[in-house]
A protein has these predicted regions:
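Acidic, glycine-rich A-domain
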Residues: 1-210
Length: 210
């Protein structure tokens, strides 16, 4: 085959849309239990950050993305911003965070979901997606019933605002865990132990950003 001398688009790739219509908020649980390994391998926090790094890279030029790690307890919650919506998309901030962020204390997911939803609701993009990467029942509450009720209320409020809420779950897929997550999130759950998880992500992303 031959390339004309005056060809100007030999190595040109198709440019992303000039206007991004989607905003993503990745909310990562960095509570103490996330420091435990999965099947003797890397910690759940490391795996969650690796998942977020894949999403961060895939969404470059397609969506505005904010990434936050959270922990806390009954009376205090800390949010660590890994990447803000309008920061330059250079390198991988999630990969950098792997050596800078450690598992902390408890997690009060309902509070953090509300804070993320308020932030995301201010965006002007047509689609607004909140992904919660966590490993189980929030520990920053006085009881399991209180934890489940608070998360469910926060998720329902976010959905009423027009946000799509998707939990990515880093825990064993037991009947008990599935039931607890279903009571909190009701739908759209992705378990990180799924063999076809990457395929699920790919299909999900293509569906969400179209």
């Amino acid at each position: 085959w031959k390339i004309p001398l005056d060809a100007k688009d030999v190595f040109r790739r198709k440019a992303p849309p000039s206007k991004r219509e989607t905003a993503f908020y990745l909310l990562i649980d960095r509570s103490g239990s996330m420091g435990a390994g999965i099947g003797g391998g890397n910690s759940k926090l490391f795996t969650a950050l690796a998942t977020a790094a894949v999403l961060e890279e895939a969404l470059k030029g397609i969506a505005y993305t904010k990434i936050v790690a959270f922990d806390g307890g009954t009376n205090a919650v800390e949010h660590c911003v890994i990447k803000d919506f309008d920061q330059k998309e250079i390198g991988s901030r999630c990969m950098d965070a792997m050596t800078q962020i450690a598992a902390g204390n408890g997690n009060k997911d309902g509070y953090s979901i509300r804070a993320a939803a308020l932030d995301l609701a201010k965006r002007t993009e047509r689609r607004k997606i909140l992904m919660v990467l966590s490993d189980g029942l929030p520990s920053g509450y006085f009881s399991e019933a209180e934890a489940i009720d608070d998360v469910r209320t926060a998720v329902q409020a976010a959905r009423r605002r027009g946000l799509l809420v998707i939990p990515i779950i880093y825990t064993a897929r037991t009947d008990e865990n599935v039931d607890a997550y279903r009571r909190m999130y009701e739908k759209s759950m992705i378990f990180a132990d799924s063999v076809g998880m990457l395929g699920e992500f790919e299909r999900l992303l293509m569906k969400l950003v179209r």
